[in-house]
């Protein structure tokens, strides 16, 4: 039992909770620095050649679960440990403190008041009248008053004691929501070309929703830089009516617990005409070795596949640059423009099809996270309310029956200086009533 009590005391220690918060904050910051939820080959290729911090290679990063920090065993264990520490701290400290505040403390002797942080005494010709005046004045100022024959107790701001308990409750809900989202949430990134659909299945394999990209538009400034991109989506739930929604950067779509973000854009295909051939739609792929946002394809110019040329572009507006095998520029083609002779063949670009980069997230813990955050804010605001307590006791044994001393004392959990300034004003009101 002593060992169990020591363990209980350790787990409910506020210093431990603060340490766990710092560790979780550090791990969360680490997750923003390191790439998360990528293919294992990416970590092996990137960090085996250049170890992180000079000592953690790709294999060690995968073993330490640094590729998926927010759903790793050690991160979720930290969340569970912090949640347990907050629950035990609330049970051991905050709940008893709240119960103690709701109970009236009945001080009967003046010497008990003299030990309080604030204590004053005044001589009254009519002690009962002075107590009545003090009681009325306190009630006018919003104090709760408990009046007895020769004494009174008053308190104000008791709701402030609820604040710390609400903060702990909100943090626990936030942690539960974060853990639930990490364990049960889903994340999917896809590029869709206009007219293409994405079928979303439930865990049983049944079609839950069909998502079709009807239109995709990229807005650019006069210099050609991307300013905004928008997708018009059609949602087809099984057995339900279709809905059309538009999303853009910073304006996602929320639908039945799922959130669809406009995350990126790409180029999907190019439509070309070679000589008198029909228009051919050919897929594009990215060429990171040529630049950050460069797409293209290798196109043979002879029936036997020889003498290929590289067609590359960085925008759906063009131009499309055509390079020979030795890297020399053969020409620039504009989408929708006239054909240009390339190696003896007329080559025309009809259009370039952009693709919308969609990020789909389903996080069942989000409502709990929001609720926990709101409760934490509410508790933090209530915690700022000072809880004040005041007692007044008439001297039980006056030397002269007509003159009795009224002893007044008070406590405050914060802003004691404010109560110290308020106490003389209360005493002055009592003095005025005697005159």
From Swiss-Prot:
It is a multi-pass membrane protein. The keyword Transmembrane helix applies. It holds the Pfam family ResB. InterPro entries: Cyt_c_bgen_Ccs1/CcsB/ResB, ResB-like_domain. GO terms for cellular component: plasma membrane-derived thylakoid membrane. The chain crosses the membrane at residues 14-34, 72-92, 162-182. Keywords: Cytochrome c-type biogenesis, Membrane, Thylakoid, Transmembrane, Transmembrane helix. It is found in: Cellular thylakoid membrane. GO terms for biological process: cytochrome complex assembly. Required during biogenesis of c-type cytochromes (cytochrome c6 and cytochrome f) at the step of heme attachment. Belongs to the Ccs1/CcsB family. PANTHER family: CYTOCHROME C BIOGENESIS PROTEIN CCS1, CHLOROPLASTIC. May interact with CcsA. This is Cytochrome c biogenesis protein CcsB. It comes from Synechococcus sp. (strain CC9311). The lineage of its organism: Bacteria, Bacillati, Cyanobacteriota, Cyanophyceae, Synechococcales. The gene is ccsB.
């Amino acid at each position: 039992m002593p060992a169990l009590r020591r363990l209980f005391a350790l787990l409910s220690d506020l210093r431990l909770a603060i340490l766990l918060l710092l560790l979780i904050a550090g791990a969360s910051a680490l997750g923003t620095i390191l790439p998360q939820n990528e293919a294992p080959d990416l970590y092996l290729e990137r960090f085996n050649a250049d170890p992180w911090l000079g000592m953690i290679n790709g294999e060690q990063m995968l073993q330490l679960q640094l590729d998926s920090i927010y759903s790793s065993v050690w991160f979720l264990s930290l969340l569970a440990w912090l949640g347990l520490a907050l629950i035990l701290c609330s049970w051991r400290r905050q709940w008893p403190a709240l119960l103690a505040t709701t109970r009236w403390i009945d001080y009967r002797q003046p010497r008990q008041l003299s030990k309080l942080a604030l204590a004053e005494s005044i001589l009254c010709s009519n002690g009962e009248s002075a107590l009545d005046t003090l009681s009325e004045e306190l009630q006018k100022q919003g104090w709760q008053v408990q009046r007895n024959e020769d004494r009174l107790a008053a308190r104000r701001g008791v709701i402030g004691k609820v604040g710390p308990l609400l903060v702990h409750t909100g943090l626990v809900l936030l942690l539960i929501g974060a853990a639930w989202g990490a364990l049960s949430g889903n994340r999917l990134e896809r590029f869709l070309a206009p007219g293409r659909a994405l079928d979303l299945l439930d865990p049983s394999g049944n079609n839950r929703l069909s998502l079709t990209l009807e239109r995709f538009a990229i807005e650019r400034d006069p210099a050609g830089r991307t300013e905004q991109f928008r997708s018009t989506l059609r949602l087809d739930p099984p057995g339900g009516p279709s809905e059309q929604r538009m999303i853009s950067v910073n304006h996602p779509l929320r639908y039945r617990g799922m959130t669809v973000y406009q995350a990126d854009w790409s180029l999907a295909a190019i439509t070309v005409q070679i000589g008198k051939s029909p228009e051919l739609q050919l897929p594009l792929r990215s060429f990171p070795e040529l630049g950050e946002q460069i797409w293209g394809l290798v196109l043979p110019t002879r029936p036997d596949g020889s003498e290929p040329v590289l067609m590359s572009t960085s925008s759906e507006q063009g131009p499309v640059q055509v390079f020979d095998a030795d890297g020399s520029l053969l020409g620039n083609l504009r989408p929708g423009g006239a054909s240009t002779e390339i190696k003896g063949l007329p080559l025309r670009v009809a259009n370039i099809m952009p693709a919308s980069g969609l990020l789909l997230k389903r996080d069942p813990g989000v409502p709990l996270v929001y609720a926990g955050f709101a409760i934490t804010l509410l508790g933090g605001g209530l915690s700022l309310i000072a809880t004040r307590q005041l007692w007044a006791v008439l001297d039980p044994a006056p030397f002269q029956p007509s003159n009795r001393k009224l002893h007044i004392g008070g406590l405050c959990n914060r802003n004691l200086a404010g109560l110290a300034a308020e106490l003389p004003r209360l005493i002055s009101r009592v003095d005025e009533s005697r005159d």
